[in-house]
């Protein structure tokens, strides 16, 4: 189940998920909990909630990259394997610290707290036993290209990455790939 921003096929485009619209109070309760437990500077437009689901190896296609995962419930196992861990880096121009890929394979324990991972790198859930509910906070790569109505509704529901201005939030600026200098053939890759 995905709360928040989703891409709807059939010409609809970016929208508020049906479950978010159908259960706005539940959505506000969950986003409120997420905002109080995540690092305060992490913006998110969407929340994926899974019940007893172990994701196979995949890459998140519409995710700008940085994602936080946490699992709840009485279970053992369920770590997240990722092919490319984030490592801390420093911007040469500003001296500002940020995270980037390049850390190599990593296994993250998702129980008991939020763990940062790169949704654009291959990842999967390791086997587990018991009851497991996982929450993944992320931002859709079109979080800043929403209609005014959709952006407003997402903010009302508690999502912190939703706009119609096309400008990246500072947190995400380093993760956006600028393809404007590539040839058309390179852009299709």
For the regions a language model picked out, list residue spans one by one.
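Catalytic core of non-heme Fe(II) oxygenases with the double-stranded beta-helix
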Residues: 26, 39-128, 132-146
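Polar low-complexity intrinsically disordered regions enriched in Ser/Thr and small residues
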Residues: 7, 13-16, 76, 98, ...
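Non-heme Fe(II)/2-oxoglutarate
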Residues: 1-41
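Extended non-catalytic scaffolding segments
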Residues: 1-2, 6-7, 13-14, 176-189
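Intrinsically disordered, compositionally biased terminal peptides
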Residues: 2-5, 32-33, 80, 159, ...
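A general marker of short, structured functional hotspots
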Residues: 3, 19, 54, 167-171
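Double-stranded beta-helix
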Residues: 130-188
């Amino acid at each position: 189940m995905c709360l928040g921003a989703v891409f709807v096929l059939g010409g609809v485009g970016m929208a508020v998920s049906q479950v978010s619209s159908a259960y706005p109070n539940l959505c506000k309760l969950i986003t409120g909990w997420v905002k109080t437990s995540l690092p305060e500077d992490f913006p998110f437009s969407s929340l994926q909630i899974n019940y007893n689901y172990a994701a196979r190896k995949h890459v998140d296609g519409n995710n700008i990259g940085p994602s936080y995962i946490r699992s709840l419930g009485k279970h053992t196992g369920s770590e997240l394997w990722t092919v490319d861990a984030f490592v801390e880096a420093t911007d040469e121009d500003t001296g500002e610290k940020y995270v980037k890929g390049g850390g190599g394979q990593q296994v993250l324990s998702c129980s008991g707290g939020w763990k940062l991972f790169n949704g654009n790198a291959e990842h999967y859930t390791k086997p587990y036993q018991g009851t497991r509910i996982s929450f993944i906070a992320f931002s859709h790569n079109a979080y800043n290209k929403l209609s005014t109505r959709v952006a407003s509704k997402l903010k009302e529901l508690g999502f912190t990455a939703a706009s119609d201005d096309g400008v990246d939030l500072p947190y995400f600026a380093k993760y956006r790939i600028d393809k404007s200098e590539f040839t058309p053939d390179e852009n299709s890759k």
